[in-house]
Design a protein with these regions (language model features):
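Transmembrane-helix motifs of polytopic, lipid-linked glycan transferases
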Residues: 66, 165-195, 234, 361-366
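Membrane-proximal, lumen/periplasm-facing interface regions of secretory-pathway glyco-
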Residues: 432-482, 496-502
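Start-transfer (signal-anchor) and selected internal transmembrane alpha helices
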Residues: 1-95, 199-202, 298-307
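Short acidic/glycine- and proline-prone juxtamembrane loop motifs at membrane-interface regions
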Residues: 217-227, 396-397
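Transmembrane-lumen/periplasm boundary regions of multi-pass, lipid-linked membrane glycan transferases
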Residues: 112, 118-122, 273-283, 287-371, ...
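Membrane-proximal lumenal/periplasmic loop motifs of glycosylation machinery
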Residues: 99-110, 123-150, 171, 345-349
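C-terminal luminal/periplasmic domains and tails of membrane-associated envelope-modifying transferases
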Residues: 462-492, 497, 506-626
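Loop-to-helix entry region of an early transmembrane alpha helix in multi-pass inner-membrane enzymes
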Residues: 142-180, 218, 222
Length: 626
């Protein structure tokens, strides 16, 4: 049913005036960047950045309220209680997990935290105008944009700047909005299924969503990519019952804005956008053609053109970067098994139990005419998304967030079928089996840190590996700080688990002292440059047994060879207390042509494949010799 035009309300005016105020501040900061206002802070946070973050949440809440009105969703008292209980359970679990863990965030797990610290410093040092420009550039040119950090800046203002509290604030900020939208999604799906027991369906749906481990894995490990899922569910809610039979400019505006926000959140959400809108567009146009509603086709085409033109303008620099890059080559180290292997991985992520629920929902959804189109849409969306994603790389836990809506929909259809049962004993038995298993599955994942869980359960351990070597890592760090002066570095070759350079860099955050002396490291073929610190660092560290990733072991073998070792002497070693021993080598002779030539010969094949990552580095080193 088409929504009627509405009058402006107080929320609309607040958003309009706050947007105008920020726009004025942006212009003034470009002209007069040194005004005291742009240097003011609140609890150490730059006030203009704080204001931008508050505005971002205000804008998001405005979108959510409009989407709720447009979908016509109404929550009963029992629905609200179920939602409140679900959020309470989740937030309590996150708090427990964060308070009991012994974990060092590293690599992608700590990157958003570093970016959060960085965006605060950037806005304070460079001003509001340049800070916003940096955010825009990060969307255009970086794999990780600062959009998520803009949203998290205001909540993060009032807590100590530690990685654990960054995760806590991310959860407290994102989960309420996300699960409110999931609750709306359940109510919309309920209209399609028309269960006989609506209250049970909602409670069961919330149970399935709360206990779905794939939703929580990334955030619990420090990656707030879950924010993008808010935009995804908003897009689904705006399109799931809309067929372009009537013009709705507000809906078009919201969709275009949400598509932009989804792309800006994380670049790989574009795979979901492509798959979803291809499926959606084909469905809408086919329906219109079959019913001979040519005006619907016209509206669909015009919306597509307007959206495409807007995205082309907004993301033109990003489009150029993507077209020039050869991601299938540079990300080849992450493409380990292709499409078929990814299907197997997804089955393992889900586990036999949840996979059975999804398959049951698929069969039931196809059999029932009311849910047939929705079920087929979800299936095609899943397989199409996986197919185009694996043209570049395979999916990690965080990437799998883009499949969560389809998985959840198929589980809801399964449970919706149960809620249509008329015999009470069958209803009680079936719902107990499905929800009982999902609860057990969630509990197993929530209490496990194992790399591999039994096949009936989701292979998604939610407890990070508990470290027993933090004091030993700190001892290595203290040694590095004592022996490295300003400008000197210690290069750590291992690049796997449990040891890699980032483990040492991140161990004492928010103290960044060690990061000034320990480089990020290099190992991934096609992505990382040749580690020139093998020839420039004052110290080089390696370990036994070795922790490998991609080229790391080859770098280690090369370093321990005769020619490089002529330039080093071992000066220290550290027993990490878990079977690993670290050895520290000090450079006693400066690099020379023989050493450079040795690495050139050893990595000739890699340089031939990626000259910009190897030969260019060696050329610069040779220039330094001259």
């Amino acid at each position: 049913m088409e929504q009627q035009p509405r009058k402006m309300n107080a929320f609309d005016w607040v958003l309009i005036f706050s947007t105008l105020a920020l726009a004025v501040l942006f212009v003034i900061s470009g002209i007069l960047p040194n005004l005291p206002l742009f240097q003011a802070t609140i609890f150490g946070q730059d006030i203009p950045l704080f204001m931008l973050s508050v505005w971002a949440w205000l804008f998001l809440f405005w979108i959510i309220t409009n989407v709720k009105r447009m979908t016509g969703v109404r929550f009963t008292r029992s629905n609200k209680i179920a939602l409140l209980v679900a959020l309470s359970v989740l937030l309590l679990y996150y708090a427990y997990s964060l308070m009991t863990r012994q974990f060092i965030y590293y690599w992608d797990y700590v990157l958003y935290y570093r970016m959060q610290v960085g965006i605060s410093k950037s806005f304070h040092a460079d001003g509001f105008f340049n800070g916003i420009i940096d955010v825009i550039k990060s969307v255009w040119y970086n794999s990780y944009s600062l959009l998520n950090n803009v949203f998290l800046a205001a909540p993060y203002t009032f807590v100590p700047r530690t990685p654990n509290l960054f995760v806590a604030i991310s959860a407290a900020s994102i989960l309420p909005s996300l699960y409110f939208l999931i609750a709306m999604f359940i109510k919309v799906v309920e209209r399609f299924i028309q269960p006989k027991h609506g209250s049970l369906f909602f409670i069961g749906g919330m149970t399935l969503a709360v206990g779905f481990p794939l939703i929580h894995r990334a955030l619990l490990f420090g990656q707030p990519d879950l924010l993008g899922l808010i935009f995804v569910f908003l897009i689904i809610l705006l399109t799931i019952s809309y067929d372009f039979s009537k013009t709705d400019f507000l809906r078009y505006f919201l969709l275009i804005v949400l598509i932009i926000m989804t792309c800006a959140s994380r670049r790989w959400y574009m795979f979901w956008l492509v798959a979803y809108f291809v499926c959606y567009g084909v469905y809408v146009i086919l329906q219109a053609i079959l019913k001979k509603r040519w005006s619907d086709v016209k509206r669909t085409v015009l919306f597509t053109l307007a959206t495409g033109l807007t995205l082309a303008v907004v993301f033109l620099p990003m489009i150029i970067v993507v077209l020039r890059a050869h991601y299938s080559v540079s990300y080849s180290a992450y493409n380990v098994s292709g499409f078929s292997g990814e299907l197997k991985s997804q089955a393992q992520y889900l586990g036999i139990g949840l996979l059975a629920v999804i398959l049951t929902g698929t069969v039931y959804g196809i059999v029932k005419s009311k849910t047939r189109a929705l079920t087929i849409f979800a299936l095609i969306d899943v397989f199409f998304t996986i197919f185009i994603f694996t043209r570049i790389q395979n999916m990690g836990y965080h990437h799998t967030l883009i499949l969560v809506p389809a998985y959840l929909l198929l589980m809801l259809i399964c449970f919706g079928g149960i809620c249509r049962l008329e015999k009470r004993w069958m209803l009680a038995l079936s719902s107990t089996v499905v929800l009982g298993f999902c609860g057990v599955n969630a509990a197993v994942c929530a209490t496990s840190s194992a790399e591999s869980l039994p096949s009936p359960f989701s292979n998604v351990a939610l407890i990070p590996p508990q470290r027993t070597d933090i004091q030993q890592i700190r001892a290595v760090n203290r040694w590095i700080l004592e022996h490295c002066s300003k400008g000197e570095s210690a290069y750590i070759i291992p690049h796997g688990y449990p040891y890699n350079p980032d483990v040492f860099r991140s161990c004492d955050y928010p103290d960044f002292s060690v990061s000034k002396h320990v480089p990020y490291g290099s190992a991934v073929l096609g992505t990382h440059y040749f580690p020139d610190d093998l020839l420039l660092a004052k110290y080089v560290l390696t370990c036994e047994p070795f922790c490998n990733l991609s080229l790391a072991e080859k770098y280690n073998t090369a370093f321990l060879s005769e020619i490089p070792q002529k330039h080093f002497t071992q000066v220290a070693q550290f027993d990490m207390g878990n079977g690993y021993i670290f050895y520290v080598y000090e450079r006693i002779l400066p690099m020379d042509r023989e050493e450079i030539q040795f690495y050139q010969d050893t990595f000739a094949q890699e340089s031939k494949q990626f000259p910009e990552l190897f030969s260019v580095v060696w050329d610069e080193l040779i220039k330094e010799l001259k």
